[in-house]
Amino acid sequence: MTEQAPLSFTPAVGDTPLTAKQRRLLTLAHELGRDKFAGRAALWDREGSFPFANYDDLREAGLLRLCVPEADGGLGADYATYMFVAAELGRFCGTTALTYNMHICSTMWTGVLADGIPMSDQERSEHLRRRQIHFERVVKDGAVYAQPFSEGSAAAAGRAPFGTTARKVEGGWRINGRKIFASLAGAANYYGVLCTEDKGDDKRDARDTLYMAVPADA
């Protein structure tokens, strides 16, 4: 077995065994943070502004598609690899790493995490069809996804139905509700709203939870 050359830096996660893919992505994140993010970090903190320039760099480097499966044009990173990359970005710009987490999680919910959820063949086929729509937006358009889940209740933990509802209407869905917080607000291209399907019977059930990717210009 060929011994891998040591990294030229000590990663944020410390001395831990890494695969060749993890080493490559960690190096990419380190160089991006060192050369681009570090010099801008104080500006975002001082102004309380969004790091749009950093997202342009993430997009150009292909890191917005980090956890999109390779079969769908992404880099196919698993959860551990994402953690390593996020930690490395965070050592140079906390603002970017925090908001980046929200975008990446949107691709993981429908990607590697959903792959571990039992589904019937029909459900799996429909899930794969739908998630490809979102993955194409990230891969081809460099789209950024936000996650407005929070409502100040137990809904986000799965212990209650979401107060935000979605009702099927002619031409699509009508979403009605209020979210109290969303990282990437004002910067995302799509907002992944978790809501409860309104079936017209006034009976809300957590099992009727829907994920609605609402365009920013809707």
Segments from the language model and where they lie:
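A generic secondary-structure micro-motif detector
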Residues: 43-45, 75
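A short core secondary-structure module
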Residues: 178-218
